[in-house]
């Protein structure tokens, strides 16, 4: 197997990051490459559903009200997966990481620490209208219509600067 590769997906809520990441995972598996797919949003939903800690209660409240989580929560969730599951032999597919500027140096340090020096960044650019339609059709509990606009707005305000 060649050296592990990191793939980092960026895009607004509803842009199709998860769909594209899953397609990439299937492709890599067909090529007999092991990969770990870390989908931050899914990790947040799993944490809320499986934990009754004060942190999970607060996290649920923020998500249910269309808010943006504090920087440490998503970092903790995706670094926990790396610590537990990553052996250095798998490709990494990261979906929904680095949602704010303070997360960028953490992600950069992860890439350096694991010697993933040339991550492939995939940025999915879709219109707000397209993303809104997709979010409404998913039926997730966090895709409440009144919070969709705020999520798309904070993508522009917080995520785009983190990407740059």
Predicted regions and their residues:
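Glycine-rich phosphate-binding loop of ATP-dependent small-molecule kinases
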Residues: 1-164
């Amino acid at each position: 197997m060649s050296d592990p590769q990191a793939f980092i997906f960026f895009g607004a809520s509803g842009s199709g990051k998860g769909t594209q990441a899953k397609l990439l995972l299937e492709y890599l598996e067909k090529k007999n490459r092991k990969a770990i797919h870390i989908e931050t949003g899914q990790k947040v939903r799993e944490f809320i559903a499986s934990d009754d800690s004060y942190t999970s209660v607060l996290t649920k409240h923020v998500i249910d009200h269309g808010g943006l989580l504090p920087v440490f929560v998503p970092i903790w969730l995706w670094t926990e997966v790396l610590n537990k599951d990553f052996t250095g032999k798998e490709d990494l597919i990261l979906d929904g990481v680095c949602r704010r500027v303070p997360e960028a140096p953490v992600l950069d340090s992860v890439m350096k620490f694991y010697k993933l020096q040339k991550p492939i960044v995939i940025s999915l650019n879709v219109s707000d209208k397209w993303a809104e339609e997709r979010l409404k059709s998913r039926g997730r509990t966090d895709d409440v219509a009144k919070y969709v606009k705020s999520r798309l707005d904070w993508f522009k305000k917080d995520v785009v600067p983190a990407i740059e």
